[in-house]
């Protein structure tokens, strides 16, 4: 789907993405790290009806529109980052770092890692966020 024209007229969301080098630095010195990736992260965010209308397209079967965010929408990255920052706010900087759909759970003490992961999974479950089962690594030293 080509959203070039829609992206031209839609105002840019200037919500900042985290700096990768700062995220890497924020994981230094931890006993255990776990890496996870949201499964088709953008497609897990429903679009409001007003925005859905703007994504309409015609096929042989009639008029259709996107019900979930598309990767190619101008503000997809900023919207997703704002969402995960809000959802994981109590954990970010403490036991977790998030860059769009990529999540790192970090523990200073190995014995706390299961508990730190559990808190993350509880939030993921509460908001029905699915993980990519092909893109995860748990318990990296």
Please name every model-derived segment:
Residues 1-141:
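Retroelement reverse transcriptase polymerase core
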């Amino acid at each position: 789907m080509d959203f070039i024209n829609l992206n031209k007229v839609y105002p840019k969301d200037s919500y900042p993405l985290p700096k990768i080098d700062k995220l890497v630095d924020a994981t230094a010195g931890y006993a255990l790290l776990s890496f996870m990736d949201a499964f088709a992260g953008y497609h897990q965010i429903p679009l409001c009806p007003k925005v859905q209308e703007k994504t309409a397209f015609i096929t042989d079967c009639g008029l259709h529109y996107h019900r979930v965010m598309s990767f190619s929408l101008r503000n997809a990255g900023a919207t997703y980052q704002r969402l995960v920052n809000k959802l994981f706010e109590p954990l970010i900087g403490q036991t977790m770092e998030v860059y769009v759909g990529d999540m790192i759970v970090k523990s200073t003490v190995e014995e706390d890692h299961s508990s730190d992961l559990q808190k993350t999974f509880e939030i993921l479950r509460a908001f029905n966020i699915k993980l990519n089962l092909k893109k995860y690594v748990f318990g990296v030293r």
